[in-house]
Amino acid sequence: MIKKEIGYAYNDLTIVPSIISNVKSRSETNCMDANGRLPIFVAPMSSVINHKNYEIFEKNNLYTVIPRSVNYEDRMKLFGNNGTLFNDIHYRFIALSLNEFKDCFCSEENVKNNANKHFNVCVDIANGHMQYLYDLCKKAKELSFKYNYKLVIMTGNIANPETYREICMMTINYEPIIDYIRVGIGGGSGCITSSNTSIHYPMASLIDSCNNIRKELQLKNCTKIIADGGVRNYSDVIKALALGADYVMIGGVFAKCLESCGAKMFTNYKGEKEMCTADAAYELYEKGAQLYTRFYGMASAEGQIAINHKKTKTAEGITKMLPVEYKLHKWVENMQDYLRSAMSYCGAFRLDEFIGKQTLIVNSPGEIAAVNK
C-alpha cells in the first residue's frame, strides 16, 4: 500500500508571522519553560556528553541525558541527590538499556526500597515500536505507584504518528505510562538507518501529525513530544517547536561546540590532523586554530563499542570529523535570541503560546535553494 500524501522535512517549510503582533520587542518574550530552561535536550551520544562534561550543559539551561557509554555505577549516582523526591532533579535523565531498565525498575525486589525517591529514566533503544518495551514500562509504572516513588519515563524512537496515539492512550490512574517520547528515526547526522533500511517519516510532518493527534485526544496529561534528529541549525529547532514539539533533542550541533566530550583534533604544521587533550584544545581554540571533533552515531561500530565494548551488530551509524565552530554559551545565547525573535513575530509572549500554535507554509523549490545558501 502506498500512502498518497506528501511528507515534509524542516527545510520544506517556513513559519508565517501573525497578522498583527502585540509584542513590541523580543525582550518581552520568555523562551524558557516552567523549569527556567530552554526546551532542548542534549542527545545521549558519547561523543557529545558524558559524566565529566554534563554540568556545563546543565549550567547553560539545557536538559541532559547521560549516555549508556558511561559506567553503570556512575550513571546511577547521577540520578541526583540520592534520588530523593524532595530534592529531585527535573532536568537530567539517565539512559538505560532495555535490560538495565528491566532489572532496575521491573523487579519488585529491586524497587521496594525506593519510597519517596525520584528517577528520570531514558529507555534508550532504537526501535520504539516494540510491544515488549511498553509492557515493561507499564510494569515499571505500576510498581512506582505501589511503592510510592516518582518514575518519569522517556523512550522511543518512533516514526509513525499512530504509534504516538497508542502511546498517549497508555495510562495508569489517568497518568501517562510514557512521559516523553522521542519521535524521529533515521534523521540524525550520525545515523544511516534510513539509507539502509528505508525506515523514516519526514520530521516536520511527523511532529505536526503527532501534535494534531494530541489536540484530537484532548487528554489532561499527554505524552510530551521530543523531536529527535535532523536539526542542523537554530531555524530547525524553532520550526520543530512551532509544529508542536515540546522539546528538541540535539546531537551533531552540540558536537561542534568546544565543550563536547568527543576527541579533539587539530591540523599540525605538516597539514596532518593530530589528536590533542581537552586542555590543549581550549588553548588552540583561543589562538584561532581550527579544531575538529570526532563524532559518531551511537548505532555506529564506534558507538556500539562505546556501549558494549565490542561491535555487536551491523552498524547503522557513521563516524566523521566535525569542525568546532563555537563555545556552548554563545550557541545558547544565539538560540535564545533567535527563538525570542521568532516568538515576537508570531505574537507569543510565552513559550506555551508558541509551541504547536503556528502556521507554516510549504516553500517552492527555488525558495528552498535560496534558504540553503
Where are the regions a protein language model picked out?
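Active-site entrance/lid segments in N-terminal catalytic domains of soluble metabolic enzymes
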Residues: 1-224, 252-254
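Alpha/beta catalytic cores of nucleotide-metabolism and tRNA/nucleoside-modifying enzymes
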Residues: 1-21, 174-176, 198-227, 231-373
